[in-house]
From Swiss-Prot, chain A:
It holds the Pfam family Ras. The lineage of its organism: Eukaryota, Viridiplantae, Streptophyta, Embryophyta, Tracheophyta. GO terms for biological process: protein transport. InterPro entries: P-loop_NTPase, Small_GTP-bd, Small_GTPase. This is Ras-related protein RABG3d. Keywords: Cell membrane, GTP-binding, Lipoprotein, Membrane, Methylation, Nucleotide-binding, Prenylation, Protein transport, Transport. SUPFAM superfamilies: P-loop containing nucleoside triphosphate hydrolases (SSF52540). Intracellular vesicle trafficking and protein transport. GO terms for cellular component: Golgi apparatus; nucleus; plant-type vacuole; plasma membrane. CDD domains: Rab7. GO terms for molecular function: GTP binding; GTPase activity. GTP binds at residues 15-22, 63-67, 125-128, 158-159.
From Swiss-Prot, chain B:
Keywords: GTPase activation. InterPro entries: FAD/NAD-bd_sf, GDP_dissociation_inhibitor, RabGDI. It comes from the Eukaryota. Belongs to the Rab GDI family. This is Guanosine nucleotide diphosphate dissociation inhibitor 1. The keyword Phosphoprotein does not apply. Interacts with the GDP-bound form of RABA5C (via C-terminus). It comes from Arabidopsis thaliana. GO terms for cellular component: cytosol. Regulates the GDP/GTP exchange reaction of most RAB proteins by inhibiting the dissociation of GDP from them, and the subsequent binding of GTP.
Amino acid sequence: MSSRRRVLLKVIILGDSGVGKTSLMNQFVNRKFSNQYKATIGADFLTKEVQIDDRIFTLQIWDTAGQERFQSLGVAFYRGADCCVLVYDVNVMKSFDNLNNWREEFLIQASPSDPENFPFVVLGNKTDVDGGKSRVVSEKKAKAWCASKGNIPYFETSAKEGFNVDAAFECITKNAFKNEPEEEPYLPDTIDVAGGQQQRSTGCEC
Amino acid sequence: MDEEYEVIVLGTGLKECILSGLLSVDGLKVLHMDRNDYYGGESTSLNLNQLWKKFRGEEKAPAHLGSSRDYNVDMMPKFMMANGKLVRVLIHTDVTKYLSFKAVDGSYVFVQGKVQKVPATPMEALKSPLMGIFEKRRAGKFFSYVQEYDEKDPKTHDGMDLRRVTTKDLIAKFGLKEDTIDFIGHAVALHCNDNHLHQPAYDTVMRMKLYAESLARFQGGSPYIYPLYGLGELPQAFARLSAVYGGTYMLNKPECKVEFDEEGKVSGVTSEGETAKCKKVVCDPSYLTNKVRKIGRVARAIAIMSHPIPNTNDSQSVQVILPQKQLGRKSDMYVFCCSYSHNVAPKGKFIAFVSTDAETDNPQTELQPGIDLLGPVDELFFDIYDRYEPVNEPTLDNCFISTSYDATTHFDTTVVDVLNMYKLITGKELDLSVDLNAASAAEEE
């Protein structure tokens, strides 16, 4: 095993309801896809180890758990994110138009120390639908928006077919790691509430 | 909206969020709404700008205090007993995975005009000036009795039925002095007044055992733990649990109006011209003001400081209990302090709270003994609010209203209210007998 320290990176996935955020996460982590749409139930955060060159990263990928549907994500969801993935559906213009809102909401809630350079990645999902015939957002338009927001990396994906998903998450991992501060941030020593130490016995049995 | 739910929860206070989480896990279809655009309701944690807006009516706080987002100022400051009911709820629901905790540095008590540490180890107990040598011996015997007491083992009862013998009579058997009784009753058993002395001793003994177990659990300087980023994390964590199990969340919904049918049973909730139907409503008192009655007022001072509370050995997180008798009041006063070490303020800043039940028409003045313990203060705010309890009959109208949070700096009453409401709503008892050692063993697999 590599003696290098393992890096835990928090990645959050934002976007309108129904664009495929949960499916992307499941495709990447579990290699699964479900056609049955239900506003997200049961999705939480998932972790996956990613090896890039000789380095191992642990990605902690946070889904919105459906709370984005009525703009009801709390500040705790955003805290500590190392990279923000913005997802839209290439077949739904409104989901692309709302990327701006999601990006701004993230910057307000997360308050990163360097907002100009915080790493975003944009995914245009569902490129498989109708063999591409119902597409309404052109790749050119999407790339132009990404360029205008500080050259955000852009990937076109299909969670259903697994197209480009790994490449997208590799980019996400690299950018998240670049954002990780060099010096260790102030980390209070926390305790494990769910585990805990064996209780000290009171009085000996002898 | 314009849908049908089994339960609609109004207000995202901690109690409401725990219930929302539990009910969603049970498979009920839950809609959870709040008039604010943030989670927590009256139990939220505010950033600096939110604090300024609420108490000063200004949009922006002074720049010299640091970044607004670095502050998480609790509106309901409480510490968690490490082995207490709230920890058991967190473990039962697996909500601990969304949270990080740190032990609280110290627990202190105000006795004879001085702040004294509540001993956390036998060594500290021996050195403590709280008791003289002979009193320590008597207290040691009492603590041993409590430690050994097992309701199911009559040999440990020493001939006393704690379901009948009062606390006062039990303590009299050990010959303890007034100040010791005060210290044990308020700083260890965490009673908020002296009524317990005339009640059966069982409750007090169980509380003392909980204190000892919590102290032993993480072997810190106190029996308390507290989440990083403040208590506002707790409602959000339970809300996420609810969402993961299908709960629907709508913040920023003004004027949530509860609708009733001709029989007086709840039928739905209307907001912004849309109505969601439901069978039951769960809410905090502010959403159904005609079904609650006032039961008192809480007075609280909130201070931003640049130093720890004096005489607490530079503790970065600390509780000081001021027993009622020491102040000549009817109920205790609580001082609670946390800081950048729990990520609730920028580096070098401390947030302190002084809380008590208001007993006069001049609550701010009542808080002065606690404020005097703080030392120099950068900013001071006062929050005086009424407490309510429900007076409706849930079996008739299907409305389940929580009781307002009290002034104590621990969560016992909060969880008891939640558990009682859960039973009323579902007819089921929540089994919280989490085996903490089993949790540890499971983790090691």
